[in-house]
């Protein structure tokens, strides 16, 4: 059995960044590893330039994310996408090299009315304990948000802690069950999997390495 910290990520808008170039800022369908690490880092009060603490956090935790169905007034609310348009004056120098003028255009994507349940557990190399993370989530040092500062939470982050043999069973303790699960750990070794570039390279800002997510469709095993 292993200890799990369970989080709820819900809000009117969320944005979980994907690889991008120039002005288009897409969002993933569920929270990325880099986004979840950033959220935890904010709760713990870790500064962006504190690379040793960020590296320790990254090496200490793994995640499984369940995509939940949102019900309001007994009605199912479908997740939709939103794209907004910005112009930016005085952008970073690396962007200016891509443009013929100082003002750049950006299109930013968001998920609307999405809700996720996240199971977090410690790796064998962890330098922190679940109770430390629980305390930080209950009383964050910096304001947590859902991928971007314009995306506040509408539900407390903390759902609970539990003991379970794997992340799938940990998530079964919290309603609503049945949504697709994306896990950093394969439960049976027979899941579908895909590669995502969402592992932050701590010493190289805004650079990401590739890693794998395992898919449990509808909360059930999916063989390859």
UniProtKB/Swiss-Prot annotation:
UniProt-listed Pfam families: Cas_Cas5d
Gene3D superfamilies: 3.30.70.2660
InterPro entries, A to Z: CRISPR-assoc_prot_Cas5, CRISPR-assoc_prot_Cas5_N, CRISPR-assoc_prot_CasD
A GO cellular component entry from the record: protein-containing complex
UniProt superkingdom: Bacteria
Molecular-function GO terms, alphabetical: DNA/RNA hybrid binding; RNA binding
Keyword vocabulary terms for this entry: Antiviral defense
Keyword field contains Ligase: no
Inducing stimuli: Repressed by H-NS, activated by LeuO. Activated by the BaeSR two-component regulatory system, possibly due to envelope stress. Part of the casABCDE-ygbT-ygbF operon.
Its job: CRISPR (clustered regularly interspaced short palindromic repeat), is an adaptive immune system that provides protection against mobile genetic elements (viruses, transposable elements and conjugative plasmids). CRISPR clusters contain sequences complementary to antecedent mobile elements and target invading nucleic acids. CRISPR clusters are transcribed and processed into CRISPR RNA (crRNA). A component of Cascade, which participates in CRISPR interference, the third stage of CRISPR immunity. Cascade binds both crRNA and in a sequence-specific manner negatively supercoiled dsDNA target. This leads to the formation of an R-loop in which the crRNA binds the target DNA, displacing the noncomplementary strand. Cas3 is recruited to Cascade, nicks target DNA and then unwinds and cleaves the target, leading to DNA degradation and invader neutralization. CasCDE alone is also able to form R-loops.
Complex formation: Part of the Cascade ribonucleoprotein complex, with stoichiometry CasA(1),CasB(2),CasC(6),CasD(1),CasE(1)-crRNA(1). Interacts directly with CasA and CasC. Stable subcomplexes of CasBCDE-crRNA and CasCDE-crRNA also form, both of which are able to bind target dsDNA, and at least CasCDE is able to form R-loops. CasCDE and CasCE complexes have endonuclease activity. Binding of target ssRNA or dsDNA causes a conformational change in the Cascade complex.
Family: Belongs to the CRISPR-associated protein Cas5 family. Subtype I-E/Ecoli subfamily.
Designated name of the protein: CRISPR system Cascade subunit CasD
Organism: Escherichia coli (strain K12)
This protein's encoding gene: casD
């Amino acid at each position: 059995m292993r200890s799990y910290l369970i989080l709820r990520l819900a809000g009117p808008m969320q944005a979980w960044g994907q690889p991008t170039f120039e002005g288009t800022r897409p969002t993933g369908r569920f929270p990325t590893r880099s986004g979840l690490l950033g959220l935890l880092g904010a709760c713990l009060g870790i500064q962006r330039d504190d690379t040793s603490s960020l590296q320790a956090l990254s090496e200490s935790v793994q995640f499984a994310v369940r995509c939940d169905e949102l019900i309001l007034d007994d009605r199912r609310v479908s997740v939709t996408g939103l794209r907004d348009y910005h112009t930016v004056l005085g952008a970073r120098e690396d962007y200016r090299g891509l443009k013929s003028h100082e003002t750049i255009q950006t299109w930013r994507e968001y998920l609307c009315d999405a809700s996720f349940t996240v199971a977090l557990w410690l790796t064998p190399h962890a330098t922190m304990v679940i109770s430390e993370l629980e305390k930080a989530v209950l009383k964050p040092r910096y304001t947590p948000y859902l991928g971007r500062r314009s995306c506040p939470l509408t539900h407390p982050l903390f759902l609970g802690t539990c003991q379970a043999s794997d992340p799938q069973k940990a998530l079964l303790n919290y309603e609503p069950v049945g949504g697709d699960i994306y896990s950093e750990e394969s439960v049976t070794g027979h899941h579908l999997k895909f590669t995502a570039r969402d592992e932050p390279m701590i010493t190289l800002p805004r650079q990401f390495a590739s890693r794998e997510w395992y898919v449990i469709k509808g909360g059930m095993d999916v063989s390859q």
